Amino acid sequence: ITEYTPLGSWPTDDILVDETIKSMDATPDQQDLVYTITVQGHGDYPTEKVIENPEITVSGAKDEATNNQWEYYINEIHEVDKFIGKLKDALAQRDEKTILVLWGDHLPTLGLEESDMATGDIFKTKYVTWNNFGLEKQDADLTAYQLLAHITGQMGIHEGTMFTYT
């Protein structure tokens, strides 16, 4: 790993594109479940200015320290967005049927309160799916532990070790 976030505390997520594809290529004659966890958007968000020339600037927070925290977070999430685009493009080139599921397991540690959220709940995050074979979108309000069963059910997968214990 050679690329790290500006604070040096987390590797950047772009390394995961090639690693995910390598994992899928390692089993050419079987279906894969590749569970890739990203970390680039995590961390303590610095109160001092860290990114010298940010692609996205932030203003309007209660003080400069909070602006710096949000600016750091937003720019890291912008980099994550680029990673997701690269991963989606790499998966789109494959002949293997693929579903990409993206979700966040928590909101950033930026002092958010329920009143700050459109849902009124700081413990809810959105999920997004993409596929390369035209599977119709199905919106569902799911908990994290229901998501795997929902996605595999869409694919017609109802057997295997992971279903033995559900």
Residue ranges of predicted features:
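Solvent-exposed soluble domains appended to multi-pass membrane proteins
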Residues: 1-166
